[in-house]
Amino acid sequence: LVDIASKIQALFLLPPGIIIVTALLGFLIQIRWLLAGSFIVALSFAALLILSLPFTGQRLMADIESRISPLRLTDAADGGPAPGAIIILGGGRYTEAPEYGNRDSVSQVTLERIRYGAHLHRLTGLPILVSSGSPYGEQVPEAELMKTALESDFQVAVKWIESQSANTLENARYTKIMLAQAKVRRAYLVTHAFHMPRAVWSFENEGIHTIPAPMGFTTLNKEDRETLGYFPSASGLHLSSIALREHLGMLWYKLKHGKVKFSPATKPATAN
């Protein structure tokens, strides 16, 4: 319930929710103070326009993703313990998928993560741990869906299933227990690039040494880079919303946990 409440609050702090609320506030203020209310309404629509540009979304994402580098496997021996596992974080589910007999499946975001996790497994031969629970009380934990997809679609076995977590901090907390029992001191961590800085901090805070294995970096196609990126679109607003949500998440970590740094200087050494 706490996780649901936090997500509802985020809806009103992120676009388009916050823009709608601000615009409505402006319309109400217009009743008594026409000029001030009109300014707030105009500012709201200007914000909507700017945040709907794919170029804006890409720049907001780049501010996060530039804190982390793509994984290179040429030399993982950087003086730290050898990695003993691959941790893949869940990213949501596809609820009651009609094409799969109305059974839940992994979302597109989660599918992208397990695909890269399977790729990394084939390169390293390391066992896989999938991590995600049932934050909204679903009958089948997301980690179970990830295991099914990895084994049936990618022919990759899953060794550990962490199915209690409802957020990134809990991913780290419950994963720590499993890895400690298996005497794994360090692991590759797979999640989207925009989520990686916060994920790395969460795991390091629990004492789990990770090698970030980010995927899904934000790129613009040729049309968006040259022309369409400067025209508002629903996809542009969606991209901006994802980036701002992650910025909001990092701000919350700083407020809740004190001195938190999401920067290249604080990330663990990567393989290179």
Labelled PLM ranges:
Residues L1-I29:
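Membrane-embedded alpha-helical segments of integral membrane proteins
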Residues L1-Q9, T56, L60-I64, L244-L251:
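Hydrophobic alpha-helical segments of integral membrane proteins
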Residues V21-T22, L53, G57, H257:
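Alpha-helical transmembrane segments of polytopic integral membrane proteins
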Residues I29-G37:
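Membrane-interface helix-boundary motifs at transmembrane edges
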Residues F39-P54:
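Hydrophobic membrane-insertion alpha-helices, especially the h-region
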Residues I50-S233, S240:
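A structural signal for short, hydrophobic/glycine-enriched beta-strand patches
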Residues D224-F231, G236-N272:
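Extracytoplasmic/luminal low-complexity segments enriched in Pro/Gly and acidic/polar residues
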